[in-house]
């Protein structure tokens, strides 16, 4: 049985500085959001507009359930409306810990507002149980997008070179760096330290833009000032899913503090250098090396992730975020969950 799906994209997807990412959503889906929900004033106003816009759409559509994916602050609009309208809320990927990010607080808040949980690992299931969630409300699926990566036909270096007008045949590192809640001091010097360390390796550098967290403008201005239109550097606002994983696949290594440097990189068997505390608390695959903001430490670990012996060891790497869960079973599982008379009657389970 098919489930008709509607997608609401939050305001950030319609912003020029983030590359109008709404354009990368598959056209076969029913997108019910639009750029009229954006305010240029501030994020709080955008958040408020999103709530009103989504509530209006939900009133018209009358959905049987709402799905929230991830832990960005914008995701809170779904749970708020779910509670107010008494619509079942399904949350993907709760139970994780990222101590250095504001997403940490949002993730656990969404978990407590959700009626059913699809989690990445057994450890994350245990954590939700610690939060008082009933066991029957949780299923371990792994990160489902990793199944798509295994089936994906990656873009070649030639195809990427033609698209971006950049020579991908020269070895490059892929940098994604987001603001970290507890590391906002001396932000420019932290980025400068990373850039200097990569430059010492004489590698080309491909940089994707940061997310919309507080102080993202500082990062954007800095990388544009120091890297834009300079030989051997490529800045990308938003490249879409297929191009991004192709960029990862073809890179020498990933560097920065993005979750993709932990989750997706392991499936692609690409070395990754995770810097700082943004991802602290997450399960770390063996292709990932973590270090602090210290020049000697960063340089030493760049040598490690760029080492051929280290790369060879990754051939048999098992990603802890992968699972044998069959995506084709999802509609059947969801329909069964919706029949449970206690779905909306949450209890706090003491243990």
Listing of model-derived features with the role each one plays in the protein:
Residues 2, 14, 22-24, 35-135, ...:
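Active-site and donor-binding regions of nucleotide-sugar-utilizing enzymes
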Residues 2-6, 201-204:
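A generic structural motif
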Residues 14-17, 113-189:
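A nucleotide-sugar donor-handling region in carbohydrate enzymes
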Residues 33-37, 119, 139-141, 235-237, ...:
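Short acidic-hydrophobic, aromatic-tinged amphipathic segments that line or gate anion-handling sites
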Residues 68-69, 76-80, 91-92, 117, ...:
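A donor-sugar binding/catalytic signature common to diverse glycosyltransferases
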Residues 200-238:
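Catalytic donor nucleotide-activated moiety binding site of glycosyltransferases and closely related
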Residues 307-351:
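C-terminal amphipathic helix plus adjacent low-complexity
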